Amino acid sequence: MTYIQVKNEGKFYPMGEALIMANKDVTFDIEKGELVIILGSSGAGKSTLLNILGGMDQADEGEVLIDGVDIAKLSSHELTNYRRDDVGFVFQFYNLVANLTAKENVELAAEIVKNALDAEEVLERVGLGDRKNNFPAQLSGGEQQRVAIARAVAKKPKLLLCDEPTGALDYQTGKQVLQILQDMSRKEGATVIIVTHNAALAPIADRVIRMRDARIDSIETNPRPQDISSLEY
């Protein structure tokens, strides 16, 4: 079942008297429950696209259909509801609240939606049950990233958007984070989109979208995604 349809999406930013093209004629479909990787070098337009899919920015051209609704035409209030109810975000930098414990950071996100998952249960799922009462400064980078994932997962998002989620992590911790994201797709049915410049991650995806110079360069589907345990990158 098609969950995301992007049709001729374009995004431009003014710079002086010129317009900078961030996305141009971007078109693709994503099926519900897929794990998708968007690849591209810095400046290719992939983070802009992720922000538009997440309702943090809006397209200037084209359509961005999420579950049949064109979010490019939503009001600011409607976009807020969309982000709250349907979307989870994971970034390279964890954005945890420093004076809240791991559990409290997860609870903070869970409070804004109905039927959220239990914070302790989600922290157990990401291997941090014994660290729930620690503050961010007491956690390693990998542990902080897993708290950030738990915070996103607790909302039970239909769409999980991840911008370079392993970029600041060591190899083993990065694989742990990728396993959690793959499980969200395989076991929870969430549609997971990972933006990265690391092409070595492509084999784990159901679909790989490559961007270059603000446009889609290629789209590939993978009938047999690789297990994280056997991934080398």
Regions found by a protein language model. Name each.
Residues 207, 215-233:
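Conserved beta-strand-loop-alpha-helix hinge in the C-terminal portion
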Residues 3-4, 9-211:
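ABC family nucleotide-binding domain
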